[in-house]
Amino acid sequence: MATTSHNKPSLFPLLSLLCFISIFLLLSLSKRASLSSPKTHRSATVFPPKPDGSLSPLSATCDFSEGSWIYDPNPRSTRYTSSCKEIFKGWNCIRNNKTNGFEISNWRWKPKHCDLPSFDPLKFLQSHRNTNIGFVGDSLNRNMFVSLFCMLKSVTGELKKWRPAGADRGFTFSQYNLTIAYHRTNLLARYGRWSANAKGGELESLGFKEGYRVDVDIPDSSWAKASSFHDILILNTGHWWWAPSKFDPVKSPMLFFEGGRPILPPIPPATGLDRVLNNMVNFVEKTKRPGGIIFFRTQSPRHFEGGDWDQGGTCQRLQPLLPGKVEEFFSVGNNGTNVEVRLVNQHLYNSLKSRSAFHVLDITRMSEYRADAHPAAAGGKNHDDCMHWCLPGLTDTWNDLFVATLHTIKAL
């Protein structure tokens, strides 16, 4: 009996190994989840299988926001050229002789589990007849608007300038009666200069002499009618909320009002952003057209190195960042020059919880890699432009994402 018991293999080492493997896998999954950006309201799209039941590259759930940039040394013909007249001079990196101006568009975004196709501008025009599309936000939304315009303009010459109420730019593609417009608004909410009243007041009693009045419950006049006019709306805000050159916290602070009265005690910009987002989201939900499709675009990243724009910061890279470098640039824990992008997104995601009327266009992750795609010194300013994007360039991919998501929404 003793001999038999000694010959039996012990199960303890095997059980120990299985426990170790299980713990390792759990820790690995936990770490992966902690490094990824929020999944809520992502640009995740469900595509049906092919008629024969086989899986296509777009089958199953596709999270377009996670992937990598693949260099194509022999890309297909460009979708539009640097001669598109709507391109703002400072963004025309090819004409401005930026070193990698031609190569910027050679990089293709490849999501992890599917493909993001380049949209067909002619098919888009044909399938969106009698449609109004509005971009509402700061100059980064104009960047995206110009990209879409140039791609559509490349396949049709029938065009007329026409601006809806409040719009800064607008065009109608006559043959298709499709209008696209850009409504400029930095904060979404109405704001303007504020100066102390000689007769005194609530803010004056606290020592405020001047600043900027921000009415958190009133949309800026540039887009107040946009949600009831456009069939498709793409909104953004973020960059101007932490702009000390404009809203100096001491010399010209943001002073928030609601219901026509100052919010007391005064609140910081981060809290003001939350108030504005909640109010503007409510406004759009109440005023949008029946069947209207509303997107909120996530924050576009900046890529300043060596300081901010007014501190000698530059962006001279000629290739996309590697994943590890992306975290150095943008991790909230590092609190670096460019951390604004993820901070703004936290506010955005919080404001859109349980908001079924909104679709989030998550361009942040794919854009965080593209430190090479800004105008930089070729922007013609007295400092590197590491905030806007070259055209042709990255915002063309934003529009691919926009169109792919739009088609899926309409197919549901």
UniProtKB/Swiss-Prot annotation:
Disulfide bonds: none annotated. Its main location: membrane. Keywords: Membrane, Signal-anchor, Transmembrane, Transmembrane helix. It comes from the Eukaryota. A motif (GDS motif) lies at residues 137-139. GO terms for cellular component: Golgi apparatus; membrane. It is a single-pass type II membrane protein. It is found in: Membrane. Pfam families: PC-Esterase (PF13839), PMR5N (PF14416). The chain crosses the membrane at residues 9-29. GO terms for molecular function: O-acetyltransferase activity. InterPro entries: TBL (IPR029962), TBL_C (IPR026057), TBL_N (IPR025846). A motif (DCXHWCLPGXXDXWN motif) lies at residues 385-399. Belongs to the PC-esterase family. TBL subfamily. May act as a bridging protein that binds pectin and other cell wall polysaccharides. Probably involved in maintaining esterification of pectins. May be involved in the specific O-acetylation of cell wall polymers. Contains 2 motifs that are conserved in esterases, but it is unlikely that this protein belongs to the catalytically active pectin esterases. This is Protein trichome birefringence-like 13. It comes from Arabidopsis thaliana (Mouse-ear cress). The gene is TBL13.
